[in-house]
Amino acid sequence: MSFRIAGPRLLLLGLQLFAKAWSYNLDTRPTQSFLAQAGRHFGYQVLQIEDGVVVGAPGEGDNTGGLYHCRTSSEFCQPVSLHGSNHTSKYLGMTLATDAAKGSLLACDPGLSRTCDQNTYLSGLCYLFPQSLEGPMLQNRPAYQECMKGKVDLVFLFDGSQSLDRKDFEKILEFMKDVMRKLSNTSYQFAAVQFSTDCRTEFTFLDYVKQNKNPDVLLGSVQPMFLLTNTFRAINYVVAHVFKEESGARPDATKVLVIITDGEASDKGNISAAHDITRYIIGIGKHFVSVQKQKTLHIFASEPVEEFVKILDTFEKLKDLFTDLQRRIYAIEGTNRQDLTSFNMELSSSGISADLSKGHAVVGAVGAKDWAGGFLDLREDLQGATFVGQEPLTSDVRGGYLGYTVAWMTSRSSRPLLAAGAPRYQHVGQVLLFQAPEAGGRWNQTQKIEGTQIGSYFGGELCSVDLDQDGEAELLLIGAPLFFGEQRGGRVFTYQRRQSLFEMVSELQGDPGYPLGRFGAAITALTDINGDRLTDVAVGAPLEEQGAVYIFNGKPGGLSPQPSQRIQGAQVFPGIRWFGRSIHGVKDLGGDRLADVVVGAEGRVVVLSSRPVVDVVTELSFSPEEIPVHEVECSYSAREEQKHGVKLKACFRIKPLTPQFQGRLLANLSYTLQLDGHRMRSRGLFPDGSHELSGNTSITPDKSCLDFHFHFPICIQDLISPINVSLNFSLLEEEGTPRDQKVGRAMQPILRPSIHTVTKEIPFEKNCGEDKKCEANLTLSSPARSGPLRLMSSASLAVEWTLSNSGEDAYWVRLDLDFPRGLSFRKVEMLQPHSRMPVSCEELTEGSSLLTKTLKCNVSSPIFKAGQEVSLQVMFNTLLNSSWEDFVELNGTVHCENENSSLQEDNSAATHIPVLYPVNILTKEQENSTLYISFTPKGPKTQQVQHVYQVRIQPSAYDHNMPTLEALVGVPWPHSEDPITYTWSVQTDPLVTCHSEDLKRPSSEAEQPCLPGVQFRCPIVFRREILIQVTGTVELSKEIKASSTLSLCSSLSVSFNSSKHFHLYGSKASEAQVLVKVDLIHEKEMLHVYVLSGIGGLVLLFLIFLALYKVGFFKRNLKEKMEADGGVPNGSPPEDTDPLAVPGEETKDMGCLEPLRESDKD
């Protein structure tokens, strides 16, 4: 099988963006790069050979292209000599192909141009080099088209009628002279005939040759005829007299007649004799303004008339008509049949693509057959060429560019196939597969694969892949570098061989965010670079920022859809552009027996080294192999058994995956150990208290081990599932270049891209006896009846359950409770043996019935030990607007993972709880009730006592279940020794009939003075408010012998069936009483008491007056003494002193003025 590199055929522009990169076994630190003084297209194609790299550098501007040989011993490349070549190659290096079997190299220049009769022909020039590159062995120009100058005999038939003035006639002559001058160096022959009423030959073909093609001599003495315009007659005249051999006409020349006139024909007739003459008519002047007048010229023109009729409004425009006339003539040159293509191999561009396989060379020829394209099958000497194209050659295949890319598809059991791309076919592109012929046979088209997106350039790049390297190409990769979708530019379609046809199996894409990235502009099959014995593929995307290369690893049956590595151009060389425009990687260039990959860029070629791929074999072991239960379980005893933890040993060794590499390997391993890494809380801890431990160690192909230790927190709940120990590892990168590592040092490998995590579990020790098989025996019990459920907004229900295990340890014990939908789970708590034992419940939303719900509780998760008994309490809230029966029934069932079905008879229990509905009744006495009366001997003997009670029934959610209510009014019974008697009556609003009954008197009335003796029973009608009036008549029936106070009590209570209902706010809220205080006043005779008291008071007053007189109280002269002393006794101010008087002035007693003395007047 050959290996070819077909890079992008367009000169690509670069972008400067940023991209991420993945790292696998292609080292992004370039081993070497090559340069040459060959312009920016150096690197357009790259190809590895035995001792280096061949680089193609097509020319740009006035520069020629060339080939360069780059050796690893030097950074600069030398031109490849083209000894014996006498051609200048403008685009040499655009196409390179190599023969893997023979080592020969084919290089082509598809742009060998030359001029033929003022037309430019394009064909190819190919060189076949030996493996040593010492000059080309062979060279050839495949599909070279010799310049076959077309012979054309052209007659000017010009109008000389009287409608022309002299100036316009001269302009017609100048136009003919100009055409003759410009085509003088061609195979054209000219003749001229003037027509009016008659015809006149101005010069024949013979005259044209004799006069040395001089138009000034031939037309210098022509004079206008100035008569009618007999056009029919003139055309027949030319056929009969000018297109004749005796006039110099050539039998093998194309006959062209150019008619110039300024008016419509004056005569009639037919021109059938001119059917084999191409007729081009030019109408000039204002006579042909209307469309109808223009149509009069159509009869003289060839078909299609739109192409062969030209209307000019002035004669001055004749001088600009030559280009159009030349194009019309050139389109028919060399052929008289319009059903053939205009171009055959003149513009073939042969060599735009090439491939070699076992000495069999093919080159693409996109310009053949009017750009329909095809390819050329070359002999080994490059001298013979057989053109193969798409047949039949219809209009829809023109412009398809078949042969833009070619690729051999090798086969072991049959003749090989050749894939040829036509990226412009019907604007969507297609790829045709042909089967190579046997000796002397024909190529057969076997399959057509069409693109789907307009403008995607589907087939612009082809690559055949021998996946398992057995000589059979299993995959065909078709590039569409202009494909657009999902913000990605470019796509590669993978087709797999299925018997005789190829079917698409996958698509390869680049990174999003590069709509113009040209992913798939270069595709190449590498050797096995990752050591899995499958061919890998590299895809170039030269316009993703500075360019990028993707590596897709082979896998059984195809290619991995995701790249194992993306190498950015900026990552390799800052400032590089178009990185990935060409790629090749099949040989070792560094001497380490690992294939290196060569990547072309703008003006530079980069060599990327492969690194040896290894795997790391790891082993984990524990001591002890099981975790003792005493290390992790909760302990409530004073003495705890000593805990030692677990020892962990981790061993590593390198396992090479690239056996061709024979050097030394040394790797620096980074590892991370995790204990229960998948849990929120780890059950194992390293000495530093963390569940994670990291470190580095050096490893080699020899086994090396590390020792670790971990312990456990107290009270681990999950003692069933083993502890997961995970070891995650990677290789650390070292600084330096790949070449540094190859110079006498151990090679740093790369780790295989797989899951680099090893996990191992260490189980917990099981207490299951000698057979190591635990068999549990669970029992569930609950009180048959519990306290009632009182329905209210904040009501709750607590149910106690007892669970015991008389067998061995039970695993994952679960208690399932079925309860009515009127209840909602609130909480669960452990009562016995202690609250630290774990229990959790969850109300299930699925699996419940219409009437009941299910609660799932995990008890003592995960182990319920042998002989253990627990009591737990489950609490529920009630839901409003629920329907209830007389009893609530709860059914419980206990399960575990290791109980025999024959022991599950006692795993269920049920409890029944009575339901009480709320009654919200409030009673209170009214303010207008009688609270006090009194009796005197002289007062009335009879008084009325009135007690008024209000009964309010508050609405509730359970009014529909309201019980029968009865008001009980209690009134006292008179004592026999009391001086008063009383009678009672009860009335209600709304009015009902009340019945009275005597109550049994207690033995001791003194202790219960308000105990009723008579009770009235009044049925209550359900209303929001009810008034009950108790009226008593109290009569003084005996004489009041002494004053005393008595109490009369009436009471009210509301009764109902307490077995189904309860007072919402307690029974006291529906009870009330009124206490009446009765005073009995005994009146006595008090007149003599009053008289004696008055006399005693007067006597006492007289005695006091007499005593004061005897002591001289009324004869004292204290005032005079004070005035004589001028002071105040005891330092106190005089009584008449004004405290507000001005000092130094005498204060006068304004209430006791003395007479004015004479001495005071001065």
Curated annotation (Swiss-Prot):
<feature type="glycosylation site" description="N-linked (GlcNAc...) asparagine">
    <location>
        <position position="881"/>
    </location>
</feature>
<feature type="glycosylation site" description="N-linked (GlcNAc...) asparagine">
    <location>
        <position position="185"/>
    </location>
</feature>
<dbReference type="Pfam" id="PF20805">
    <property type="entry name" value="Integrin_A_Ig_2"/>
</dbReference>
<feature type="binding site">
    <location>
        <position position="588"/>
    </location>
    <ligand>
        <name>Ca(2+) 3</name>
    </ligand>
</feature>
<feature type="transmembrane region" description="Helical">
    <location>
        <begin position="1089"/>
        <end position="1109"/>
    </location>
</feature>
<comment type="subunit">
    <text>Heterodimer of an alpha and a beta subunit. The ITGAL alpha subunit associates with the ITGB2 beta subunit. Interacts with THBD. Interacts with CD226.</text>
</comment>
<feature type="glycosylation site" description="N-linked (GlcNAc...) asparagine">
    <location>
        <position position="900"/>
    </location>
</feature>
<dbReference type="InterPro" id="IPR028994">
    <property type="entry name" value="Integrin_alpha_N"/>
</dbReference>
<dbReference type="Pfam" id="PF08441">
    <property type="entry name" value="Integrin_A_Ig_1"/>
</dbReference>
<keyword id="KW-1015">Disulfide bond</keyword>
<dbReference type="GO" id="GO:0098609">
    <property type="term" value="P:cell-cell adhesion"/>
</dbReference>
<feature type="glycosylation site" description="N-linked (GlcNAc...) asparagine">
    <location>
        <position position="668"/>
    </location>
</feature>
<feature type="domain" description="VWFA">
    <location>
        <begin position="153"/>
        <end position="325"/>
    </location>
</feature>
<feature type="short sequence motif" description="GFFKR motif">
    <location>
        <begin position="1112"/>
        <end position="1116"/>
    </location>
</feature>
<feature type="binding site">
    <location>
        <position position="466"/>
    </location>
    <ligand>
        <name>Ca(2+) 1</name>
    </ligand>
</feature>
<feature type="repeat" description="FG-GAP 7">
    <location>
        <begin position="565"/>
        <end position="625"/>
    </location>
</feature>
<feature type="binding site">
    <location>
        <position position="596"/>
    </location>
    <ligand>
        <name>Ca(2+) 3</name>
    </ligand>
</feature>
<keyword id="KW-0597">Phosphoprotein</keyword>
<dbReference type="InterPro" id="IPR013517">
    <property type="entry name" value="FG-GAP"/>
</dbReference>
<feature type="glycosylation site" description="N-linked (GlcNAc...) asparagine">
    <location>
        <position position="270"/>
    </location>
</feature>
<keyword id="KW-0460">Magnesium</keyword>
<feature type="topological domain" description="Cytoplasmic">
    <location>
        <begin position="1110"/>
        <end position="1162"/>
    </location>
</feature>
<feature type="disulfide bond">
    <location>
        <begin position="841"/>
        <end position="857"/>
    </location>
</feature>
<feature type="disulfide bond">
    <location>
        <begin position="1018"/>
        <end position="1049"/>
    </location>
</feature>
<feature type="binding site">
    <location>
        <position position="474"/>
    </location>
    <ligand>
        <name>Ca(2+) 1</name>
    </ligand>
</feature>
<feature type="glycosylation site" description="N-linked (GlcNAc...) asparagine">
    <location>
        <position position="86"/>
    </location>
</feature>
<dbReference type="GO" id="GO:0046872">
    <property type="term" value="F:metal ion binding"/>
</dbReference>
<feature type="glycosylation site" description="N-linked (GlcNAc...) asparagine">
    <location>
        <position position="444"/>
    </location>
</feature>
<feature type="glycosylation site" description="N-linked (GlcNAc...) asparagine">
    <location>
        <position position="728"/>
    </location>
</feature>
<dbReference type="GO" id="GO:0008305">
    <property type="term" value="C:integrin complex"/>
</dbReference>
<dbReference type="GO" id="GO:0005911">
    <property type="term" value="C:cell-cell junction"/>
</dbReference>
<feature type="binding site">
    <location>
        <position position="536"/>
    </location>
    <ligand>
        <name>Ca(2+) 2</name>
    </ligand>
</feature>
<dbReference type="GO" id="GO:0022409">
    <property type="term" value="P:positive regulation of cell-cell adhesion"/>
</dbReference>
<dbReference type="GO" id="GO:0006909">
    <property type="term" value="P:phagocytosis"/>
</dbReference>
<feature type="glycosylation site" description="N-linked (GlcNAc...) asparagine">
    <location>
        <position position="696"/>
    </location>
</feature>
<feature type="repeat" description="FG-GAP 6">
    <location>
        <begin position="505"/>
        <end position="561"/>
    </location>
</feature>
<dbReference type="InterPro" id="IPR013519">
    <property type="entry name" value="Int_alpha_beta-p"/>
</dbReference>
<keyword id="KW-0472">Membrane</keyword>
<feature type="repeat" description="FG-GAP 3">
    <location>
        <begin position="336"/>
        <end position="387"/>
    </location>
</feature>
<dbReference type="GO" id="GO:0007229">
    <property type="term" value="P:integrin-mediated signaling pathway"/>
</dbReference>
<feature type="repeat" description="FG-GAP 5">
    <location>
        <begin position="444"/>
        <end position="504"/>
    </location>
</feature>
<dbReference type="Pfam" id="PF01839">
    <property type="entry name" value="FG-GAP"/>
</dbReference>
